[in-house]
A protein has these predicted regions:
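RNA-interacting cores
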Residues: 1-261
Length: 261
């Protein structure tokens, strides 16, 4: 399984940052109109893929700007749409000129300033990132999940109001496997079936929830999990790049994973 991605960092002055924060929560229709080529999702002609994954998620993630920085991830077909993404950010933030861009490498370090797209973009492999993350979780049985923006997960037709470790882990696996299947190389589906079964062994040992910002719904806070973290930790770690739940492509459901022991 694999998926090509590009990670970008865009510095923002304070007024532009606040406008983008507002746009991500209130102007999603405008963003989808700007990025029509990426938001026009069509079902695959492969009936088995549709049965397993249904409608694909959007192949990009615009993080909520923080501390003067907007992080952006482009996956698969979105990489070729970099000019449209830059134009969208420029327009919604009300910038007079396109912003500076910084491309990131496998370690999250800046390797290229002002990429213009095409062959010069440093394209990363999710499989490569997974390989790099795996040693951090060797013999790991406990990890911490830090929910940084409200997570809105649906289960059995209802929105979860508290953190549930099994649903969280399986949600990350579903999002990861769906994006890989639709926009990359799916690999062996039995791998995700096995991991989903392992996720049933994740249990919550410490919860420190936080209230969602005024006017927003979702789960926030820090949660400590025990279970088969050596097997699931690397994929949860890399899954953090993709966010999770409702509004994931627009900054919601941002999280970080940290091995504890």
């Amino acid at each position: 399984m694999d998926l090509n991605i590009v990670r970008l960092r865009i510095p923002l002055a304070a007024p532009y940052e606040q406008r983008l924060v507002t746009a991500l929560s209130t102007q999603r229709a405008a963003i989808e109109q700007h990025l029509a080529n990426l938001c026009r999702r069509t079902l695959s002609s492969d009936p088995e893929l549709v049965r397993r994954h249904q409608k694909p998620g959007l192949p990009f993630v615009l993080s909520v700007p923080c501390c003067g920085v907007l992080d952006c991830l482009l996956a698969g077909p979105a990489i070729a749409e970099l000019p449209a993404v830059v134009a969208t950010v420029t327009d919604l933030a009300g910038m007079p000129h396109p912003p500076q861009l910084f491309a990131l490498d496998y370690q999250g370090d800046v390797v290229l300033q002002r990429p213009r797209g095409g062959a010069e973009l440093p394209v990363l492999s999710l499989a490569g990132l997974l390989d790099l993350a795996t040693p951090r979780y060797t013999a790991c049985h406990c990890l911490q999940v830090q929910l940084q923006t409200p997570l809105r997960l649906m289960a059995e037709g209802r929105e979860l109001r508290r953190f549930e470790p099994v649903r969280f882990a399986r949600g990350v696996l579903r999002r990861f496997s769906s994006l890989v299947a639709h926009y990359g190389a799916a690999g062996n589906p039995e791998t995700f079936i096995r991991l989903a079964e392992l996720a049933g062994g994740m249990r919550l040992v410490d919860a420190r929830p936080l209230p969602a910002p005024q006017g927003q719904r979702g789960v926030l806070g820090s949660f400590t999990l025990q279970g088969p973290c050596d097997a699931l930790g690397p994929l949860l770690d890399i899954g953090a790049l993709l966010h999770l739940g409702k509004g994931a492509s627009f900054g919601m459901g941002a999280f970080q994973i940290r091995p504890l022991s």
